C-alpha cells in the first residue's frame, strides 16, 4: 500500500548511481536520502534497505534494482541503484529505469577502474544525456595532488566517450562521513553540493506529451461506412482530429489524415501520450497499415534498416540460449509491436558472443523500421526472448 500522498508540486527527474563495484554507490545513495530527508523531508534509507534490492522483470529479464526517492529545494528525484555489475548492464540496456542523468561514483583512493569505464561507455551507448561525478572516499586520501590526478583521469575518461569532461561537475566527498552525520566539507556539505549539481546541471526532461506525435500500431480494423481504425498506445505527443500524419515502417511511408480519435468507445477531439486510442484514418485501406508500423507527425521519424546497437544476451539460467552465437547470426528483432529478421555483425576481433555477455553490434534488418537512437528492442528466436538491446547509432 502506498505510504503518504505523492505531492506532485515539484518537477520530477530520474537519476541513478553508476560506477565500479565497491566504490560506494549504495552508501552514497543512502547518504543522499539521509541528508536530504533531514533538510527537505522524505524518507531516509539505510544501506541495508537499498542493498536488498528487489527483483523485477523488464522485457523478460530479471534485474535487481533499488528505487529510492528524495527531494531537493527545487525538484523531486527518483533514483535507481543496482547491487551488481550485471544488473547495471541489463538495466541500462533494457531501459528498465530510464535515467535523465547519472551520478558516477568513483573512489578517490582507487581512481577509475574497469567498470568505471564500462559504465561511462554504456551511458553513452544507451543515451544517458548527463553525468555528474562524485569522487568518494576523499577522507582516505591526504595528498591533494593525488586527488587532482584522479579527477584529471576521470575527466579524460568522460571526454573519451563524448561527455564534456571539462564541464562536468566533480564533487569531492565521503558518503561514509555523510552517513555518520559529519557536517564538514566532505560530509553533509558534499551531499548538498551534489544536490545542487543535480538541480543545475541536469535539465528538466521533456515531458512525453510535449514530444512529436508517435503511436506504434497494435491493431488495424475496418469499420464499414467509417473507414480504417488503427489502435495503439500513444507513446508521445498529441494527435488532434484533422491533423496530417504519416505511416512509417515496413513499407513505403504514406501520408494520411486523422479523422477521429476514440477512447473507451467515446469520441474525443484529441489523444495524448499514455492514452490507449483508436485513430480513424481518411482514405487509408485496411491492407495499407500493419502492426509494427507507427503513426507519427510528418517528417518526425524515418524508417531505417542499418544501425549499431548495444545488446545484452540472456544467460542460460535466464531462459536464454545455451550456446554462443557467431558473426552473421540472424535472429528476429522485436521493435515496439513486431519482429523483423536481421543479421548481426560482431566487432572486429570478437569471434563469438556467450550467453550472459553484453556486446556492441551492427545490424542489418530485412525490412525498415521507424527508428531513432535510444530505441529499445528485444532479440528473439522462435518467439522466445534471447536478448535485449538499444539502438546506439543509425547508419542508414
From Swiss-Prot:
Residues 10-206 form the tr-type G domain. Residues 174-176 are annotated as: G5. GTP binds at residues 19-26, 81-85, 136-139. It catalyses: GTP + H2O = GDP + phosphate + H(+). Residues 19-26 are annotated as: G1. Belongs to the TRAFAC class translation factor GTPase superfamily. Classic translation factor GTPase family. EF-Tu/EF-1A subfamily. This is Elongation factor Tu. The gene is tuf1.
Amino acid at each position: 500500500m502506498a505510504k503518504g500522498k505523492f505531492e506532485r508540486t515539484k518537477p520530477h527527474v530520474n537519476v541513478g548511481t553508476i560506477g565500479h563495484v565497491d566504490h560506494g554507490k549504495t552508501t552514497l545513495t543512502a547518504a543522499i536520502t539521509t541528508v536530504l530527508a533531514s533538510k527537505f523531508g522524505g524518507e531516509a534509507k539505510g544501506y541495508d534497505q537499498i542493498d536488498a534490492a528487489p527483483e523485477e522483470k523488464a522485457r523478460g529479464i530479471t534485474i535487481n534494482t533499488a528505487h529510492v526517492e528524495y527531494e531537493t529545494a527545487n525538484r523531486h528525484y527518483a533514483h535507481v541503484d543496482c547491487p551488481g555489475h550485471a544488473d547495471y548492464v541489463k538495466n541500462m540496456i533494457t531501459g528498465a529505469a530510464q535515467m535523465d542523468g547519472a551520478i558516477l561514483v568513483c573512489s578517490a583512493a582507487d581512481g577509475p577502474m574497469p567498470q568505471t569505464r564500462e559504465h561511462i561507455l554504456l551511458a553513452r551507448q544507451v543515451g544517458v544525456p548527463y553525468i555528474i561525478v562524485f569522487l568518494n572516499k576523499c577522507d582516505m586520501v591526504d595528498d591533494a595532488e593525488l586527488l587532482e590526478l584522479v579527477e584529471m583521469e576521470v575527466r579524460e575518461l568522460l571526454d573519451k566517450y563524448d561527455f564534456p569532461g571539462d564541464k562536468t561537475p566533480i564533487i569531492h566527498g565521503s558518503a561514509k562521513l555523510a552517513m555518520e552525520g559529519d557536517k564538514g566539507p566532505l560530509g553533509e556539505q558534499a551531499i548538498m553540493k551534489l544536490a545542487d549539481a543535480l538541480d543545475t546541471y541536469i535539465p528538466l526532461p521533456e515531458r512525453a506529451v510535449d514530444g512529436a506525435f508517435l503511436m506504434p500500431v497494435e491493431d488495424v480494423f475496418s469499420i464499414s461506412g467509417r473507414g480504417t481504425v488503427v489502435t495503439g498506445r500513444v507513446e508521445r505527443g498529441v494527435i488532434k482530429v484533422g491533423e496530417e500524419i504519416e505511416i512509417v515502417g515496413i513499407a513505403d511511408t504514406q501520408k494520411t489524415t486523422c479523422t477521429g480519435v476514440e477512447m473507451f468507445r467515446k469520441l474525443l477531439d484529441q489523444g495524448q501520450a499514455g492514452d490507449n486510442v483508436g485513430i480513424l484514418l481518411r482514405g487509408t485501406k485496411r491492407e495499407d497499415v500493419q502492426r509494427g508500423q507507427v503513426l507519427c507527425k510528418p517528417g518526425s521519424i524515418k524508417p531505417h534498416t542499418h544501425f549499431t546497437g548495444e545488446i545484452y544476451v540472456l544467460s542460460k539460467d535466464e531462459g536464454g540460449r545455451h550456446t554462443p552465437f557467431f558473426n552473421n547470426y540472424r535472429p528476429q528483432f522485436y521493435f515496439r509491436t513486431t519482429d523483423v529478421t536481421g543479421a548481426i555483425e560482431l566487432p572486429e576481433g570478437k569471434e563469438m558472443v556467450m550467453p550472459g555477455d553484453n556486446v556492441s553490434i551492427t545490424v542489418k534488418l530485412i525490412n525498415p523500421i521507424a527508428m531513432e537512437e535510444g530505441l529499445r528492442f528485444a532479440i528473439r528466436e522462435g518467439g522466445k526472448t534471447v536478448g535485449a538491446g538499444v539502438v546506439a547509432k543509425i547508419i542508414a
